[in-house]
Amino acid sequence: MSCPVIELTQQLIRRPSLSPDDAGCQALMIERLRAIGFTVEHMDFGDTQNFWAWRGQGETLAFAGHTDVVPAGDVDRWINPPFEPTIRDGMLFGRGAADMKGSLAAMVVAAERFVAQHPDHQGRLAFLITSDEEASAKNGTVKVVETLMARNERLDYCLVGEPSSTEIVGDVVKNGRRGSLTCNLTIHGVQGHVAYPHLADNPVHRAAPMLNELVAIEWDQGNEFFPATSMQIANIQAGTGSNNVIPGELFIQFNFRFSTELTDETLKERVHALLDKHQLRYTVDWWLSGQPFLTARGKLVDAVVNAIEHYNEIKPQLLTTGGTSDGRFIARMGAQVVELGPVNATIHKINECVNAADLQLLARMYQRIMEQLVA
């Protein structure tokens, strides 16, 4: 199949960029962008490769994404080696095809076509690309954003190429994401022999009423943009492995996916109040992965909706569901942030694939968004 979007996607898939290794993907993109007049700035931190590229000046539309992928898993279960892209029945198979090398290829080809038609475009077109999104996400987009903010870079609109669609490309776009807050809680007791409970203090027994109350709390009711805040216990650990020892500590890890109805500080206060109410001895460590963000209807959302309606003749759903994305960092710059990418049904799975025709369509959508905002 001779299509520049498919060809570039295949070239990117052939580079086994297991997070945070870029494996040469960014060099491939940079070569194409420099050829059409982009200025490229490398922003590497630790073992992570990032770049910020721009062309023109004025109102800025950035396309953001990541070159890294998750491990392939059992390669023997793939219909083809995961880093050897193949097309079967119109589907392009390969690790990263949907998440998100297809989007990266569509962005680059869209930029090439846009610049060819609008060499003197009015606004600034930019790219923010990282190799650290799938793993720790500590040296990737967040560090680039901090650098850009420190020098007062302008970023008005950002389109993240995460695979947002569910059945056909463009049926769902994400105009926000919930916040993510993790609590690592240790309840302290006194270890002892199970036959002498009066000489010990079992932290599991102590914590049980608190846990029962914790899981029953309705944190909020959500709002028109976000579902209700969710709390899920992810890990519980206690005991020595012996059946005759009362444990001295209980470790509980739980995560909140929270809406704009709450702040991380409010959640922390409510958890601490619950622990104190039950008179527990505890230590707690909090990790805020990201604040919730929302892009209301405006120029970017309207441009994205217009592009989808024009090329796919459907009206997309605007949702904030799912996990976190690098959009949470970019939103700090005050930018309108929207995620639009291919169908996500096979991401992170064996035999990850994407409809090849969808990638061609996605490139056209990206180009039309550019034309509406920075032409």
UniProtKB/Swiss-Prot annotation:
The active site is at 68, 133 (proton acceptor). It catalyses: N-succinyl-(2S,6S)-2,6-diaminopimelate + H2O = (2S,6S)-2,6-diaminopimelate + succinate. Its cofactor is Zn(2+); Co(2+). GO terms for molecular function: acetylornithine deacetylase activity; cobalt ion binding; succinyl-diaminopimelate desuccinylase activity; zinc ion binding. The keyword Hydrolase applies. It holds the Pfam family M20_dimer. Its EC number is 3.5.1.18. Coiled coil: none annotated. GO terms for biological process: diaminopimelate biosynthetic process; L-arginine biosynthetic process; lysine biosynthetic process via diaminopimelate. Binds 2 Zn(2+) or Co(2+) ions per subunit. PROSITE patterns: ARGE_DAPE_CPG2_1, ARGE_DAPE_CPG2_2. The keyword Ion transport does not apply. InterPro entries: ArgE/DapE_CS, Bact_exopeptidase_dim_dom, DapE_proteobac, Peptidase_M20, Peptidase_M20_dimer, Peptidase_M20A. Zn(2+) 1 binds at residues 66, 99, 162. Belongs to the peptidase M20A family. DapE subfamily. Catalyzes the hydrolysis of N-succinyl-L,L-diaminopimelic acid (SDAP), forming succinate and LL-2,6-diaminopimelate (DAP), an intermediate involved in the bacterial biosynthesis of lysine and meso-diaminopimelic acid, an essential component of bacterial cell walls. Homodimer. PANTHER family: ACETYLORNITHINE DEACETYLASE, N-ACETYL-L-CITRULLINE DEACETYLASE. This is Succinyl-diaminopimelate desuccinylase. It comes from Citrobacter koseri (strain ATCC BAA-895 / CDC 4225-83 / SGSC4696). The lineage of its organism: Bacteria, Pseudomonadati, Pseudomonadota, Gammaproteobacteria, Enterobacterales.
